[in-house]
Amino acid sequence: MDFSLNDDHLALREAVQRFCDGEYPAEHRGNAETPEQAQGRWAGMAGLGLLGLPFPADAGGSEQGPVEVMLVAQELGRALGGGAFVASTVMAGQLLMRLGSPAQQQRWLPGLASGERQASVALYEDGARYDWQRVQLQARATSQGHVLNGRKTGVLQGDSAGLLLVVARTSGAGDERHGLTVFAVDASAPGVQVRGFDTLDGRRAAHVTLTDVAVASDCVLGTPGEAADAVEAALDAAIAALCAEAVGVVDALMVHTAEHLRTRKQFGAPLAKFQVMQHRMADMAIALEQLKSMACAAAMAVDAGEPAQRRRLVSAAKVLVSQLGRQLGLSAIQMHGAMGMTDECRVSHFAKRLIVIGQLFGDASWHLKRV
């Protein structure tokens, strides 16, 4: 595989770096966002064209691929920013592009690209762990469409999403792939209850309960009962973007840790002079290169056209991110000492984000079964 970047890639990365440096100053990274800050940053990302990056041009996008998404995710990871980029632009956007009719894409994608609205995929359910195929939420057909009843858990940025792409079962039972259908549901529709909560890293997710929610027939994405392949592809695209984000987080983690070791003194000498610390930093640098390679491989596999290869590479990358991310985060905290556990120390926020990324969409043990 050729992992080299062309001039357009470098220009994109530089533009996102400038945006992050302005919107996420280093001394404030990891701090909780106010609603005004979140709205302003989201509008700024829309202004740069990041929110419609993979969308068709006639829907307000720039028709870029997963490598460009990877570069953006890496820079957002360095800044501990991005908000709903993975949930809305990557995962929900992929579902709309793969399943939506031209009319449906024109209906929803321009709003996502402009930042006027966010979307999120309501996928997982209670007791299913990471098995996204175990869907019990029922969609009952009516003369005007469908009626949805059930509950979804851990919907990323679910309490800020105006559009929910709900994976429901129209036929079959248990964990059958056949019978899954995606519905576009307005989050403010009657019968939709969204209960938001903070995640470990200070971001947001939500539990969504749907009680007799009426969905019109023009809000069904794709052929009823045949959505499984598209859902899996969108999920893999989101996982690849998360792996890229983890690369950025680890890169920033290394920079902050190295600076601490250079400036902090013990026994009259900087910590960087101690061999054990040098070995730890060398291990971290090696791990970062591993993560970069696997994140690139996962991104390039997203549009490779071979689902089996995509699944293997994306899951292999997620295994490495889940294992090394937590390990590197805790190692950086240890190199900072007790202060590394505090909210005032930026390293603690990088570590928490890596732990969350390691759990999202499947942990190491789950993806090892999939490789």
List the predicted regions and their residue ranges.
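Conserved hydrophobic/aromatic beta-strand scaffold that supports enzyme active sites
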Residues: 120, 136-138, 163-167, 171, ...
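Cytochrome P450 C-terminal beta-domain/meander region
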Residues: 131-149
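Flexible, small-/acidic-enriched active-site or ligand-binding loops
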Residues: 134-136, 154-155, 186-220
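Helix-loop "lid/cap" segments that line or gate small-molecule binding pockets
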Residues: 91-100
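A short core secondary-structure module
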Residues: 122, 149-193
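Structural signature of FAD isoalloxazine-binding scaffolds in flavoprotein oxidoreductases
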Residues: 63-72, 131-135, 185, 214-215, ...
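A short, Trp-centered hydrophobic/proline-enriched beta-strand micro-motif
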Residues: 115-126
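Alpha-helical interface subdomain recognition
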Residues: 1-83, 99-104, 111, 115-116, ...
